[in-house]
Amino acid sequence: MAMTVHCDIVSAEGEIFSGLVEMVIAHGALGDLGIALGHAPLITNLKPGPIRLIKQGGEAEVFYISGGFLEVQPNMVKVLADTVQRAADLDEAQAQAALKAAEAALHEKSADFDYGAASARLAEAAAQLRTVQQIRKKFGG
């Protein structure tokens, strides 16, 4: 039997996952993180993208987060996300359209253009699309 750690994934809308996992894989500010039982305590911010949970028995479940924070304690991992979606609920066509709209917004600069907001929308759309493609490639979803 594999060693497990308790994991919670929550957003402003509420808790989307709570349970025992063998590993949490997330995209932190400085790169990808693999968190398992006994990991050193840590707090880091998370970039938009997939969070993969390896549950008891090896089953994987993937979520998309738009950014947030990860807290690691000896027996607990908590993801506090701005928004969370189950990756299976993401629509690839919608993600493609959002990416194109964000790219177009960057090229159509006006006097009141907010480059930071446009860049954030582009990064989020690209992360959603990357999550959908990762699911399709690795998990046949």
Curated annotation (Swiss-Prot):
Major place of residence: membrane
Compartments where located: Cell inner membrane
Subunit field text: F-type ATPases have 2 components, CF(1) - the catalytic core - and CF(0) - the membrane proton channel. CF(1) has five subunits: alpha(3), beta(3), gamma(1), delta(1), epsilon(1). CF(0) has three main subunits: a, b and c.
Protein family membership: Belongs to the ATPase epsilon chain family.
Keywords: ATP synthesis, Cell inner membrane, Cell membrane, CF(1), Hydrogen ion transport, Ion transport, Membrane, Transport
Gene Ontology terms for molecular function: ATP binding; proton-transporting ATP synthase activity, rotational mechanism
InterPro entries given in the database record: ATP_F1_dsu/esu_C_sf, ATP_synth_F1_dsu/esu, ATP_synth_F1_dsu/esu_N, ATP_synth_F1_esu_C, ATPsynth_dsu/esu_N
Gene3D superfamilies xref list: ATP synthase delta/epsilon subunit, C-terminal domain (1.20.5.440), F0F1 ATP synthase delta/epsilon subunit, N-terminal (2.60.15.10)
Organism: Pseudomonas fluorescens (strain Pf0-1)
Transport keyword on record: yes
Biological role stated in the UniProt entry: Produces ATP from ADP in the presence of a proton gradient across the membrane.
Record-given protein name: ATP synthase epsilon chain
Any one Gene Ontology cellular component term annotated for this protein: plasma membrane
Classification of source organism: Bacteria, Pseudomonadati, Pseudomonadota, Gammaproteobacteria, Pseudomonadales
Membrane topology recorded in Swiss-Prot or TrEMBL: Peripheral membrane protein
Record has Cell inner membrane as a keyword: yes
